[in-house]
Every structure is written in structure tokens, then in C-alpha cells.
Curated annotation (Swiss-Prot):
Species for this entry: Helicobacter pylori (strain Shi470)
The keyword Lipid biosynthesis is assigned to this record: yes
Keyword terms: Acyltransferase, Cytoplasm, Fatty acid biosynthesis, Fatty acid metabolism, Lipid biosynthesis, Lipid metabolism, Multifunctional enzyme, Transferase
Underlying gene: fabH
Protein's name according to its UniProt entry: Beta-ketoacyl-[acyl-carrier-protein] synthase III
Family: Belongs to the thiolase-like superfamily. FabH family.
Active-site annotation: C115, H255, N285
Location of this chain's protein in the cell: Cytoplasm
Length: 331
């Protein structure tokens, strides 16, 4: 291989509005203590009515491109992961975001892998770069999850937040600056555990069709049990495959879904406090944006430096899951 895929830059953006747990007491039977005890979440950010996922994503994307010392014209491919796209079916949020960046005549498409979206993005970007098809790939996890939440459902609306994270994946000849390994998987037999139904309307040919509300639905207990079991196995597999141990990893950056899930994986693998990146307490579950946002916070705090090895993992609707070993190739 002449070169490897490399994570050259990372950036993030969140809306300005902070929503604390206590604010849900206005319309739900809940409390700050109840939410934090079960999830580890203290607050989250919600976008305003005018903001869309692409608006959040484009701010993060511009900074990621700048940090990679590139311009939008240098980007060969744009891929966005989101469960809250700007439009129902088309155009893709990636196309909308590309236009806002001034990128023309370059491929752009979305990935639908829910909370595992960023791991899927890494897999796609790695393949495009290492095949020689692209030199610079912009990947963006952008979510306005508040647009798909049922604020009468205590089991879901307290969990999620809005935000975006973006990375530029480029080339390197150094293995220890590369996206070392990515593994992704799915099992559609559990698709009814976590889903957003499509709104169906009657037609002149099928007047019996019933409309459904397009809000995120989740079987929380079932998802929790499967997530812990699956992630433990997946993380052990990628470490063993690459002849690595938890102590070889500089930072463990899991999807920020729920503190209890993160803690279960962390304790099983015996990660130390300084190895684990946590942001769920202040942003909630930002789905496909959570890993790049957490990665960016670590970078901006000085915890992530060039050549550091990160272990990423995620689990989401589909059901989908995945993990990655990534050396930071930025500066």
C-alpha cells in the first residue's frame, strides 16, 4: 500500500441553547435527580426552529477543513451520517451541506446507521482514500435529534441532544498516523428495538392506511442489554485482531449514549479514568455526532495529540454497531 487513510482534523459545533434536566419537569413526570441517576446526563443543547442538521454540520465542517489546512475545493467526497436529515428522502443532507460549503461537482451522500453513523463514516472514508479514489474525504455527523423526539415520551426525549462533529480523512505514509482498523456490523432482526416510523397518509387507492407519528421510538431496556453485550464483544475483537491491549490505547472514546453503558464497557476492559472521554453529561446523546464531538473536546483540551491511539465504539438503531482503532494524524 502506498498510503493509509489518516484522520487529519476534527471540529465540532453545538447550538447555544442549554436545556437542563429540571426543565423537563414542566411537562413530564421526571426530575433532575431521576434523569442524572439513570443516564448521567445533566443538560443537552437544542437547536432553534430555523436551524437544521446541515446548519450545525456546516459550521463544524468549515473548521475541520481549515484545521486540515485545506479549502473546500480540496475535498473530493462529502459523506454525512444523520438520523435527522434536513429532508425526508431527498436531497441528502450531504448535498445540502456541500452546497453551503461551496463544493460543486463532487459526490455527496448520506449514511443511515443512527448512533453508529460515525464508525460507518470512518469505514467509508478509509475505503475511498486507501483505494486511491479520493485524496480528501469530509465526514460529518450532524444531528438535530430534537426534531424527531416525542416530548410526551419520558423514555426518549430526555436522552438526546443536538450537535455536529466533522473530520477530514486524508493520506499518510505512516502507520501510526492512520485509521488503523474499522469494523462495522448490523442485525436487522432487531430493527423494532429503535426506530423512527415514517408518516403514512391514505391514498385514493388505499384509504385504510393509517398515519403514524414520525417520532423516535425505543425499547430502552432491550437496547441497553444488547448494547452492553455487543459492545464488549466487539471491542475485545478489534483489540485482539490488532494484537493490542486496553493499556495500549491512549483514549477510549465511546458513543455517548448513556453513562451506564459506557461504564459497563469501561469496567470490563479496566480502562483508567484518564483514558476515557466523557461528554454525555453536558450534551446528552447526539447520535452520529457524539464520537466526533467527544474527540474534538479531547483535542481542544490537549488530551489528544498527534500519534495518539484512540479506540472508538458505538451501537445504534438498525441495529448497527462498530468499533475503530484510529491514530490521530492531525497537528
Amino acid at each position: 500500500m502506498e498510503f493509509y487513510a489518516s484522520l487529519k482534523s476534527i471540529a465540532m459545533h453545538v447550538p447555544s441553547e442549554r436545556v437542563k434536566n429540571a426543565e423537563f419537569q414542566q411537562f413530564l413526570d421526571t426530575s433532575d435527580e431521576w434523569i442524572e441517576k439513570r443516564t448521567g446526563i445533566k443538560e443537552r443543547r437544542f437547536a432553534n426552529d430555523e436551524e437544521k442538521s446541515s446548519d450545525l454540520g456546516v459550521i463544524a465542517a468549515k473548521q475541520a477543513i481549515e484545521r486540515a489546512h485545506l479549502t473546500p475545493k480540496d475535498i473530493d467526497l462529502v459523506v454525512v451520517a444523520t438520523l435527522s436529515p434536513d429532508f425526508l428522502a431527498m436531497p441528502s443532507t450531504a448535498c445540502v451541506l456541500s452546497a453551503k460549503l461551496g463544493i460543486e461537482n463532487k459526490p455527496a451522500f448520506d449514511i443511515s446507521a443512527a448512533c453508529t453513523g460515525f464508525i460507518y463514516l470512518l469505514s467509508v472514508a478509509k475505503a475511498y482514500v486507501e483505494s486511491g479514489m479520493c485524496e480528501n474525504v469530509l465526514i460529518v455527523g450532524a444531528e438535530k435529534t430534537s426534531s424527531v423526539l416525542d416530548f410526551k415520551d419520558r423514555g426518549t426525549c430526555i436522552l438526546f441532544g443536538d450537535g455536529a462533529g466533522a473530520c477530514v480523512i486524508g493520506r499518510t505514509k505512516r502507520l501510526k498516523e492512520s485509521v488503523l482498523d474499522v469494523q462495522i456490523s448490523a442485525n436487522g432482526n432487531f430493527s423494532n428495538y429503535l426506530y423512527t416510523p415514517r408518516t403514512l397518509k391514505p391514498t385514493p387507492f388505499n384509504a385504510k392506511e393509517e398515519a403514524s407519528e414520525p417520532f423516535l421510538r425505543m425499547k430502552g431496556n432491550e437496547v441497553f442489554k444488547l448494547a452492553v453485550k455487543t459492545l464488549l464483544k466487539d471491542v475485545e475483537m478489534i483489540l485482539e485482531k490488532n494484537a493490542l491491549k486496553p493499556e495500549d490505547v491512549r483514549l477510549f472514546i465511546p458513543h455517548q449514549a448513556n453513562f451506564r453503558i459506557i461504564q459497563a464497557v469501561r469496567e470490563h476492559l479496566d480502562f483508567k479514568d484518564e483514558q476515557v472521554v466523557l461528554t454525555v453529561h453536558k450534551y446528552g446523546n447526539t447520535s452520529a455526532a457524539s464520537i466526533p464531538m467527544a474527540m474534538c473536546e479531547a483535542y481542544e483540551e490537549g488530551r489528544l495529540k498527534k500519534g495518539d491511539l484512540m479506540l472508538l465504539d458505538a451501537f445504534g438503531g438498525g441495529l448497527t454497531w462498530g468499533s475503530a482503532l484510529v491514530y490521530f494524524g492531525g497537528s
